[in-house]
Amino acid sequence: MRVAVYPGSFDPITNGHLDIIKRGAKVFDKVIVAVLVNVDKKYLFESSERVELIKRVTRDIENVEIRSFDGLLVNFLKECKTNIILKGLRTASDFEYEFQMAFINKELDDDTETVCMMSSAKNIHISSSTVKQVARFGGDISGLVPNEIISDIMSRINL
């Protein structure tokens, strides 16, 4: 069974993330969406909330599992009994960052492999940061995130 781990903050999950999850689920037998817990970072949603939001928008994808993790990704991979990291790339700067991270992960565990998927053209401009910024200024985020979570984002932004 080929299992890939798709790690990220997903704060919040975007249509770009969801696209990578759906496409990854067609390539791999199982995709584990790994929601990063970083106590040093300020998030819009707590990790448990991010897990629930992702579960809500992926409920119809049978071979997707959502989990949170902290610590080194290579250790989480071992826990998941896989060596494959799935990453989405939007821009050249994403590539440069993920290229470096792939080498770091390979240095930490030589069995680790990173598989990158190019973003779909319709999602190349979407990032969680952009979603939050647009929402904070009252803009329409309906084309940026799954419809099921728009109210969650807007109510959190407007606290």
UniProtKB/Swiss-Prot annotation:
SUPFAM superfamilies found in the cross-reference section: Nucleotidylyl transferase
Cofactor(s) essential for the protein: Mg(2+)
Cross-referenced Pfam families: CTP_transf_like (PF01467)
Keyword Amino-acid biosynthesis included in the entry's annotation: no
Subcellular location: Cytoplasm
Pathway in which the depicted protein is active: Cofactor biosynthesis; coenzyme A biosynthesis; CoA from (R)-pantothenate: step 4/5
GO MF annotations in UniProt: ATP binding; pantetheine-phosphate adenylyltransferase activity
Family matches, as NCBIfam families: coaD_prev_kdtB, cyt_tran_rel
Protein name in UniProt: Phosphopantetheine adenylyltransferase
Organism, scientific name: Clostridium beijerinckii (strain ATCC 51743 / NCIMB 8052) (Clostridium acetobutylicum)
